[in-house]
């Protein structure tokens, strides 16, 4: 009999023949070795599609019971983090040692391993995705053996943003830097017309633009400045006079400190407080990453269909990402602008809009976030990743029987 487990948003039901929550790496390796096929790992469940669905005959591996390892080496400035650890937990430990991650995503409650495996990112023209600091990957492969992959090896380009296709990540080693403080400055009513996107995007260490596409412009700008940088000069919009939430009408107390008040990096780079624990999300999410040189044209394309987009949209966030070296990284090989859409939780209403949005953006070579809602065909995805053939070969090398290849991955790799 299959067991049903839902994701965080509740829009996907994972049907698995078995669900295991191993408590040790040895127990995990034993479960993997005994599994016939369809082994998929999940920790925080923050994906919005079937990327982690093993199917009715497969095995779902929940990693949240594994030891919450966060071993900091202050001399090497690295941290070894277990496969089930979330960023909020990791950040507190790292900061206590006087060190920092270079960037974080908007939500600190997501797992480290799942985030880097799907290409998740924060913002900043000089900041790479969350996979960028990874310096070693530890995997349990199909036969239950442990494999370590580090930079300099031919396999490393496919090992971090791996979509779960190579094995189950038991630990990652990440590079760190000295701890720093950040002030978060919010502005309102930034016009789209006449926007100098490059200047705006580079105005802070991390910059996010928010709109609901009901008007041609941005209702909010979140500018995060390291305190060792100059105060932001941002004459294009008005400073916010009240605390804000990215979604209009939502309580701002859930968000990290605003008004430029300096604070530790891990309490400012995310948009949401770690102590605010979200329950199942009343939302769906999509995101498209495309060359930053096309940012204004892409925004104009969305603006032209805003009457279609706005009725099912909660908020849209525009961010930037530096180029990524991972073969399946959505910002692989290019300076990137990322257009993120938080939809209402109504799949039937949202999917037609997603299709229309993808048509509007198609000319700009968009790559959808691997873990969010999209309708882009597997054939189109293969054409947008020049190293996908190398990744396919690596997956077959480490998992020759396809034990970790579910329907989502089979369509992508074997089509």
UniProtKB/Swiss-Prot annotation:
Optimum temperature is 55 degrees Celsius. Is stable at temperatures up to 65 degrees Celsius. FAD binds at residues 106, 111, 114, 118-121, 169, 319, 369. Pfam families: ALO, FAD_binding_4. Residues 12-179 form the FAD-binding PCMH-type domain. Xylitol binds at residues 106, 317, 319, 342, 372. Keywords: FAD, Flavoprotein, Oxidoreductase. One of its GO terms (molecular function) is D-arabinono-1,4-lactone oxidase activity. Binds 1 FAD covalently per subunit. Its cofactor is FAD. Belongs to the oxygen-dependent FAD-linked oxidoreductase family. Monomer. Oxidase that performs selective oxidation of the terminal primary hydroxyl group of several alditols, with a reduction of O2 to H2O2. Shows highest activity on xylitol and D-sorbitol, and to a lesser extent, can also use galactitol, D-mannitol, and D-arabitol as substrates in vitro. Is not active on D-glucose, D-xylose, D-galactose, D-mannose, D-fructose, L-sorbose, L-fucose, myoinositol, glycerol, ethyl alcohol, and meso-erythritol. This is Alditol oxidase. It comes from Streptomyces sp. (strain IKD472 / FERM P-14339). The gene is xyoA.
